Amino acid sequence: MDLIVNSIIETISYNNYLPKRFKITRLKTISGNIHAVIVDIKDEQSEMLVALSVLEDKNKYRIIK
């Protein structure tokens, strides 16, 4: 999965929940591992730091644009 800054990703939901959309704002390196800072499209005030390997899991996230 090619992740770049300002990409929009969506959680894959197997239940009847609406999927959430996130925007990648920046990439960080922590202890030699690359992490992405993502924000919810509807709430850009809160940020989450997620390991890049989690975002590359095609069972959890997919790239929208």
What role is predicted for each listed range?
Residues 1-17:
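Short coil-to-beta transition motif at edge beta-strands of beta-rich domains
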Residues 18-28:
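Short beta-strand-centered aromatic/proline hotspots
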Residues 26-31, 42:
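A generic structural motif
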Residues 32-37:
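Short aromatic-glycine-enriched beta-strand elements
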Residues 41-65:
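Intrinsically disordered, low-complexity, charged/polar segments
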